Amino acid sequence: MSASLISALPPCGNEPPMPDEWRLYRLATRLSTFANWPFTEDCACTPERMAEAGFVHCPSDNSPDVVKCFFCLKELEGWQPEDDPMDEHKKHSPSCLFIALKKKAEELTLSEFLKLDLERTKIKMQKQMNQHIENFQAKANVVRGHLEKLDADETQ
């Protein structure tokens, strides 16, 4: 199929109908997350350049400059005005397939897009699985501590 995914989908309002996660492939969607970005002028890490590098802005009260790549889920913070978003992304997540793209997401064929999104989904699922494992291990450690305390109490 030679038509790009986004141009092949029928329009619905202002945007083609697609899952929210797919909307993040669009530069404008990522850029819209940078409304309160602390660096806007006379710097390398402008909202436009951050969004072009695949980042979405996800600030917290303690960290107003936290960003996350929508694809590889790498989170970065502590930005300085001279930091180049693409260079930082490549340095901290060199295997991110989004930054390795040789064309815009809008230019991908349906097949290319689906293969790429399959990889994004695998990354997301791996991260979720790792979080579940960490939570399980933390709870297991608490239970182990209680069991050891019970055992120690019984042997006294």
From Swiss-Prot:
Its main location: cytoplasm. GO terms for cellular component: chromosome passenger complex; cytoplasm; kinetochore; midbody; nucleus; spindle. GO terms for biological process: cell division; chromosome segregation; negative regulation of apoptotic process; negative regulation of DNA-templated transcription; vasculature development. BIR repeats lie at residues 30-100. The keyword Zinc applies. The modification Phosphothreonine is found at residue 46. It is found in: Cytoplasm; Nucleus; Chromosome, Centromere; Cytoplasm, Cytoskeleton, Spindle. The keyword Ubl conjugation applies. Zn(2+) binds at residues 69, 72, 89, 96. Ubiquitination is required for centrosome-targeting. InterPro entries: Baculoviral_IAP (IPR051190), BIR_rpt (IPR001370). CDD domains: BIR. Keywords: Cell cycle, Cell division, Centromere, Chromosome, Chromosome partition, Cytoplasm, Cytoskeleton, Metal-binding, Mitosis, Nucleus, Phosphoprotein, Ubl conjugation, Zinc. One of its GO terms (molecular function) is metal ion binding. The BIR2 domain is required for vascular development. Component of the CPC at least composed of survivin/birc5, incenp, cdca8/borealin and/or cdca9/dasra-A, and aurkb/aurora-B. Interacts directly with incenp (via N-terminus). Interacts with rxra; the interaction is stronger in the absence of 9-cis retinoic acids. Belongs to the IAP family. Component of the chromosomal passenger complex (CPC), a complex that acts as a key regulator of mitosis. The CPC complex has essential functions at the centromere in ensuring correct chromosome alignment and segregation and is required for chromatin-induced microtubule stabilization and spindle assembly. Does not appear to exhibit anti-apoptotic activity. Plays a role in increasing blood vessel size during development. This is Baculoviral IAP repeat-containing protein 5.2. It comes from Xenopus tropicalis. The lineage of its organism: Eukaryota, Metazoa, Chordata, Craniata, Vertebrata.
